[in-house]
Swiss-Prot record:
Residues 1-22 are annotated as: Disordered. This is Ethylene-responsive transcription factor ERF018. It comes from Arabidopsis thaliana (Mouse-ear cress). Residues 20-77 bind DNA. It is found in: Nucleus. It comes from the Eukaryota. Transmembrane segments: none annotated. Probably acts as a transcriptional activator. Binds to the GCC-box pathogenesis-related promoter element. May be involved in the regulation of gene expression by stress factors and by components of stress signal transduction pathways. InterPro entries: AP2/ERF_dom, AP2/ERF_dom_sf, AP2/ERF_TF_ERF_subfamily, DNA-bd_dom_sf. One of its GO terms (biological process) is ethylene-activated signaling pathway. The gene is ERF018. GO terms for cellular component: nucleus.
Amino acid sequence: MVKQAMKEEEKKRNTAMQSKYKGVRKRKWGKWVSEIRLPHSRERIWLGSYDTPEKAARAFDAAQFCLRGGDANFNFPNNPPSISVEKSLTPPEIQEAAARFANTFQDIVKGEEESGLVPGSEIRPESPSTSASVATSTVDYDFSFLDLLPMNFGFDSFSDDFSGFSGGDRFTEILPIEDYGGESLLDESLILWDF
């Protein structure tokens, strides 16, 4: 009875760790990873590790598109990747395209929230790369609050009065060198490089 309960518990844990997306699985420490098999081969292409299963699934979709074309079965059939592929891509190029497409997921979610539409994203792999790179997104900052500051706000608004400090024009007197009657202040036996 106890063994059966333990087996059921393990089975539930394993199904919870499984993803509902193709090519995606969850690591024990919580990261979602994605990889894809090459057609007619046992070799796999590692597509990366992601924070969410959706990003990992989008990476799989991009690799699926690069390897099998637009008629492949995607995790997100309503939002297939739009990657321009003029020639067959190398595994590092597929990794790069998959990473770029996966990381555009946040932009799509933001676009859905703002407009209710899913914007199409076109990705063009440039030159061959030896490693997958992650696309960076630019953030627009709103600096309109600077208009509220007074015009003379800045370094020129600080006074030049440093009354708490000396002006630096009075230096401490240099102490005179005293004669110690032939005694040297430096012990010559301590010199490291005595050749």
